[in-house]
Amino acid sequence: YFSVGKEVIKENNGFNTKGGIKEVINIPDYNYYMSTLLYNYLNNNKDKLNFNDYINKGITNNQKLYVAGIFGTSKFNDLEENLNKIFGSTLNLKPDDYYSWPSDEQPVYKYNKETNMYDYNDDVIGTDVLTDLLDSYIYNYKIKSVEYNDNGFIVTYYGLYAHFDSVGPTCVTNNSNIERYLGYDSTEDGLTDEYYLSEAFNKNKDDFFKFTYTYKKVNKNYVLIDFKQE
């Protein structure tokens, strides 16, 4: 899968205004799980909550576990730390069992109080569905701009939606005149995916969505405090 692009920015006096100090900043690199949450915030936010309310009140504990990376680590403390690095908060994460769907009778991961870890449930029926979030995510293509302030920075990307299919290729699209099935269409038209997207971008970059990420420095981390689509 594609994740939010990582890029190193060197900004003179960007944050340390005294003494001409230069700071090297790494734009946070989000995985598929986080990028899925951002898509759902834009397109599955039925109560039209703002970003802060959405991540704290608009998603379930089960979905918070998913975004925290339960499919990558079994330690509850690590899951809390992952959320802290992304949002500057644990989002009041609770050590409950993890279910793919709320209606499931069996959890995929069972929480073990004695070890403070999650154990995979061998009795669960195998499924390709990992969460009840929509199986689509944000695909950032190119950085449009970076704006600095005293507390952090704002990054705007040109990007697309990516629709994931567990039994087929992922489709990146603007829901209009750009549509590409990654790793599949190239066998039909002979073009690489990179070439197709670069041609579409060069033809009219405004055909791409604009995704804006607002970061604030909290301790040593740059945490996401807002996300918008222009």
Sequence positions of predicted segments:
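Mature, Sec-exported extracytoplasmic domains of Gram-positive
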Residues: 1-230
